[in-house]
Amino acid sequence: MAVHPIDYRYGSEEMRRVWEEENKLQKLLDVEAALARAHAKLGNIPEESARVISERANTKWVKLERVKEIEAEIHHDIMAVVKALSEVCGEHGKYVHLGATSNDIIDTANALLIKESLAIVEKDLKELRSILKELAKKHIDTVCIGRTHGQHAVPTTYGMKFALWLDEIQRHIERLQQLKDRVLVGKMRGAVGTAASFGDKAFEIEKLVMEDLGLKPARITNQIIQRDVYAELMFFLALVASTLDKMALEIRNLQRTEILEVSEPFGEKQVGSSTMPHKRNPIRTEKVCGLARVLYSNVIPALLNNPLWHERDLTNSSVERVILPESFVLLDEMLKVMKKVLKGLEFFPENIKRNLYLTKNLIMAEPLMLKLAEKGMGRQEAHELVRQLAMKAFKEGRDLLEVVRKNEEAMKYLTENDLEGLKPENYIGKAREIVENVVNYVEEMERRGL
């Protein structure tokens, strides 16, 4: 029976499969099998025993139901796996889990789950990057009003908006490469990290296990891999979520009825409200913003998991059972929703232009001030004069440039040609070059495989 929305509502089947019980059990069995193979290579156990253990360390032989049955009796999840695997291996079962402590298996298996999950996240980030890159190129010259403090500021372009997000997604992709080096690690170090239970060949055993599984050995551990590693992982997931939250929030705001410059896609048969038939609510981007709040909240317990008693206690375990699958599945949902939204983003060019001129050239106050300073008026004096003229234009509902034309002090410095040149479309500075620089950088990273 599904209870949590990640079981049935959020995330892809691909990501949910990573964290479902059967796959988690399989990863534990994979680690046990790799340990047996390492022992056999070093002559610690018979090769035939390693072969049998490896062959039967899968969920076709070791049933989840049997593991749960044993755990209900002995109240120890990993020992339940060990007993269930030993049962199906017959006389070879005595070599299962040789030298290991529970978290040798758990933490190494977690690294395998995280590796699978991060591969999905990376794929989605790269697909999102491609979508944003095309949007930045397509709208490099789409001039719109920039807003600061929710108020009209000066012109920018939609190319700038998309390139800003593109650059941030690229940083996440680069962060992910660095993160893998620290997160995709396992351990075979025993109860307190000294590896005493593995004897003289402890390092060789660990090296063989990690090479077999495609992981790196942690440099030092106590009973567990230190949870600063997981905290960094959780912060990365939350940081990606914050970028998606930022993008979704901007689209939601730009879809407001009074603005309506862009809109998330709306299906032909889609219903916006149960009582208001006309509604086109931004439910996809609202969902992204909502799920981000859960991702943010999961960072705190990850930080609290780092300080544990002595060589470890168990307070981290129950937390990680919740926050790891939940965070990966929810981020997976957010990434896939944002890909869909951006692919189908609707633009309303007439509204973009209307909003650009909505303030009757008040947004030209900055270039007007700079033009006066260029013509010989002191910069501070020009600022105060334009401020007064802008406030007058605002109060009287008049065009700023018309007010300027009737001001003797301003017109001592300005010509009609100066005023004619003050058009929003002309005041975007180096926007095109900035967007091109971002796109060029991203394309270079793509060529490098980053």
From Swiss-Prot:
Homotetramer. Residues from neighboring subunits contribute catalytic and substrate-binding residues to each active site. GO terms for cellular component: cytosol. This is Adenylosuccinate lyase. N(6)-(1,2-dicarboxyethyl)-AMP binds at residues 9-10, 75-77, 101-102, 223, 274, 279-281, 318-322. Pathway: Purine metabolism; AMP biosynthesis via de novo pathway; AMP from IMP: step 2/2; Purine metabolism; IMP biosynthesis via de novo pathway; 5-amino-1-(5-phospho-D-ribosyl)imidazole-4-carboxamide from 5-amino-1-(5-phospho-D-ribosyl)imidazole-4-carboxylate: step 2/2. InterPro entries: AdenyloSucc_lyase_C, Fumarase/histidase_N, Fumarate_lyase_CS, Fumarate_lyase_fam, Fumarate_lyase_N, L-Aspartase-like, Pur_lyase. Keywords: Lyase, Purine biosynthesis. It comes from the Archaea. The active site is at residues 149, 273. The gene is purB.
